[in-house]
């Protein structure tokens, strides 16, 4: 999965997919009442990027629905996975469940079209704080209550705080999650970060009894870092430059080893070599 980083305005969806991304990451900020408000990152953000692009969250979801609904004039068949980077740092811990409920209702209405031929992309809810694990239950319970438990087949989870792998496992246990787990590791492109924890996550994924299904590394903009990440065995690379990742994947060393995921590749099934 080539994951376009910080895609927060509707027009950027086409921009990143046309550069080679089959997945995007979108920031979601919340208001004081835990309503998803804007798709917005804000300052500071990655070096070389504008941090200030934004939409109202529901407008973005509608644009995303168009881009991922077969038959729509805006349809992009390659776009198969969306990571919502949930900016829950502005919330009190006791608002996490409420944020999950409200996010579920917004997605159900504006993205899934109330279960009636809505967007088809797989969704990853990425949460920065392990203490906010109740967001997951708020989200899953709401989809069930609204009569759409089948949509949970399209939803996965990520804790993005670079916490110890064992601590992340405990948070999932509390949240009642087993499966559909992506594990992120990374840092802003302005700084360097080694691959120690990525390798630990990959080992957990491949152990047969770990909690991780897929591992992605962020933010990867350079060819050398891309090669290191592919060599470490990641499933996804988040990037500001999808074309760079696509180029590396076409190099002789990689073109017979890795390929771009398609809609038929389940993002929840651990790939067995």
Swiss-Prot record:
<keyword id="KW-0479">Metal-binding</keyword>
<comment type="function">
    <text>Dermonecrotic toxins cleave the phosphodiester linkage between the phosphate and headgroup of certain phospholipids (sphingolipid and lysolipid substrates), forming an alcohol (often choline) and a cyclic phosphate. This toxin acts on sphingomyelin (SM). It may also act on ceramide phosphoethanolamine (CPE), lysophosphatidylcholine (LPC) and lysophosphatidylethanolamine (LPE), but not on lysophosphatidylserine (LPS), and lysophosphatidylglycerol (LPG). It acts by transphosphatidylation, releasing exclusively cyclic phosphate products as second products.</text>
</comment>
<keyword id="KW-0800">Toxin</keyword>
<keyword id="KW-0460">Magnesium</keyword>
<keyword id="KW-0354">Hemolysis</keyword>
<dbReference type="GO" id="GO:0005576">
    <property type="term" value="C:extracellular region"/>
</dbReference>
<dbReference type="InterPro" id="IPR017946">
    <property type="entry name" value="PLC-like_Pdiesterase_TIM-brl"/>
</dbReference>
<keyword id="KW-1061">Dermonecrotic toxin</keyword>
<dbReference type="GO" id="GO:0090729">
    <property type="term" value="F:toxin activity"/>
</dbReference>
<feature type="binding site">
    <location>
        <position position="85"/>
    </location>
    <ligand>
        <name>Mg(2+)</name>
    </ligand>
</feature>
<dbReference type="Pfam" id="PF13653">
    <property type="entry name" value="GDPD_2"/>
</dbReference>
<keyword id="KW-0456">Lyase</keyword>
<keyword id="KW-0442">Lipid degradation</keyword>
<dbReference type="GO" id="GO:0008081">
    <property type="term" value="F:phosphoric diester hydrolase activity"/>
</dbReference>
<feature type="binding site">
    <location>
        <position position="25"/>
    </location>
    <ligand>
        <name>Mg(2+)</name>
    </ligand>
</feature>
<feature type="active site" description="Nucleophile">
    <location>
        <position position="41"/>
    </location>
</feature>
<keyword id="KW-0204">Cytolysis</keyword>
<keyword id="KW-0964">Secreted</keyword>
<comment type="similarity">
    <text>Belongs to the arthropod phospholipase D family. Class II subfamily.</text>
</comment>
<keyword id="KW-0443">Lipid metabolism</keyword>
<feature type="active site">
    <location>
        <position position="5"/>
    </location>
</feature>
<keyword id="KW-1015">Disulfide bond</keyword>
<feature type="binding site">
    <location>
        <position position="27"/>
    </location>
    <ligand>
        <name>Mg(2+)</name>
    </ligand>
</feature>
<feature type="disulfide bond">
    <location>
        <begin position="47"/>
        <end position="190"/>
    </location>
</feature>
<protein>
    <recommendedName>
        <fullName>Dermonecrotic toxin LhSicTox-alphaIA2aviii</fullName>
        <ecNumber>4.6.1.-</ecNumber>
    </recommendedName>
</protein>
<feature type="disulfide bond">
    <location>
        <begin position="45"/>
        <end position="51"/>
    </location>
</feature>
<dbReference type="GO" id="GO:0046872">
    <property type="term" value="F:metal ion binding"/>
</dbReference>
<dbReference type="GO" id="GO:0031640">
    <property type="term" value="P:killing of cells of another organism"/>
</dbReference>
<dbReference type="GO" id="GO:0016042">
    <property type="term" value="P:lipid catabolic process"/>
</dbReference>
<dbReference type="GO" id="GO:0016829">
    <property type="term" value="F:lyase activity"/>
</dbReference>
